[in-house]
Every structure is written in C-alpha cells, then in structure tokens.
Design a protein with these regions (language model features):
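Active-site rim helix/loop that mediates acceptor-substrate recognition in acyltransferases
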Residues: 59-81, 95, 102
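Conserved beta-strand in the GNAT
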Residues: 83, 89-98, 114, 119
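Conserved GNAT acetyl-CoA-binding A-motif
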Residues: 141-153
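A short beta-loop-alpha structural element at the N-terminal edge
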Residues: 32-46, 57
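Conserved acetyl-CoA binding element of GNAT-fold acetyltransferases
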Residues: 106-122
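Conserved catalytic-core motifs of GNAT/GCN5-like acyltransferases
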Residues: 98-104, 150-156, 162, 167-183
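Conserved acetyl-CoA pyrophosphate-binding loop and the N-cap/start of the following alpha-helix
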Residues: 124, 128-136
C-alpha cells in the first residue's frame, strides 16, 4: 500500500512515497541551521567533546575550552561554522575553511573551501540534520562562487557525501609528517 506524499511529509518522512510494510526513508527532524557566533563556543565545545568520546578519546581535557576559544579567535576570519538547533539545543555542526588563491595577471583570485568537523549527536542522526547542514554549507559555497569544496570523509560518511555530488578527486596528494604513524586518524 502506498501512502501519499502529503501524508508522508506530515508523518515526518523524507521521501515522496512510502510503502507501509517497508519504510525506506528516514524520519526528518527540522532544525534551525545558522552560523556560529562567539556565544556558541560552550555548546560547540560540548559537541566536540562528544565527537572525541565517540572516537575513543578522552574528553576530560581541562585546557580544551581555552584552546577552543583561542582557535576560534584565530580561525573565525576564514572559517564558517554552521550549527543545527533542534529541541532547544545545538545538535550538530559542520564547518568550511575558506581559501583564496593568489591573484595572477588577467585572472581574479578564485575561492575554494575545505569542509570539516561534520558532526551530529547520535540521537539526531539519520533524521536529515546532516543533510540540512550540508545544504546550507554548499548553498553558501555556490552563492559565493567557490570553484570547489574538498573534504576528507570517514568511510561511513562516503555515501552521504556522494548523494550530495561529491566524488573522488584526482590530482591531490597528501603528505603525512614522519613523526605521525598510521595509528593516528587523519579525520578532523
């Protein structure tokens, strides 16, 4: 039995039609997506601590908050952080580092971005929050005329980014400093 698109949307499903016996789409949570401000640093710190815990790291670092504040002060002129708010709290984030190429004669400098630090709280995953964050970030990049957006996805996130049009990038190289080992994750 098929359910109409209108009923599916009212029920919170993110797909045009739904088979009652076999639901193949995710429940959607509408989030407010906005750019971060200094006042959001405490909540960003909580999200970052949660990400660290999920990666198996210790989140009880007493100097972390001060380092985050200093990092934000340095990075805020070239980095845009999008936040997702749902149920009265921040539940996700994603950011874009903005790069501008050096101008050359006869050509204006182009801009490109590096997408990083994408994270949604476990209780809000698979509800469309990541998609809403990504649409906001890519919408900004498109409006600003970015020539490309790069990222280094986790294995689990590859299908998510592929659905948004990302694919393998030829012509890129990576150097890992000699003191780093393969046991150190390359994700951010």
């Amino acid at each position: 039995m098929l359910v109409s698109t209108a009923i599916a949307k009212l029920a919170g499903f993110a797909c045009p039609t739904v088979m009652v016996a076999q639901v193949r789409c995710a429940l959607m949570t509408e989030a407010v997506i906005r750019q971060a401000e200094v006042a959001d640093l405490a909540a960003i710190a909580l999200l970052r601590r949660q990400w660290t815990q999920e990666q198996g790291g210790a989140s009880d670092d007493p100097g972390f908050d001060e380092r985050l504040v200093a990092w934000f002060a340095r990075e805020s002129s070239r980095r845009i952080i999008w936040l997702a708010e749902a149920d009265g709290r921040l539940v996700g984030m994603m950011n874009l580092v903005v790069f501008e190429r050096m101008p050359r004669p006869g050509r204006a400098p182009s801009r490109w971005g590096y997408l990083g630090n994408a994270f949604v709280l476990a209780a809000y995953r698979n509800e469309g929050i990541g998609d809403q964050l990504l649409r906001a970030l890519l919408g900004y990049a498109d409006e600003e005329g970015f020539v490309r957006v790069l990222l280094s996805p986790s294995e689990r996130s590859v299908p998510f980014y592929e659905r948004a049009g990302f694919g393998p990038a030829d012509g890129l190289m990576l150097r890992t400093p000699p003191q780093m080992t393969d046991s150190v994750p390359r994700s951010t």
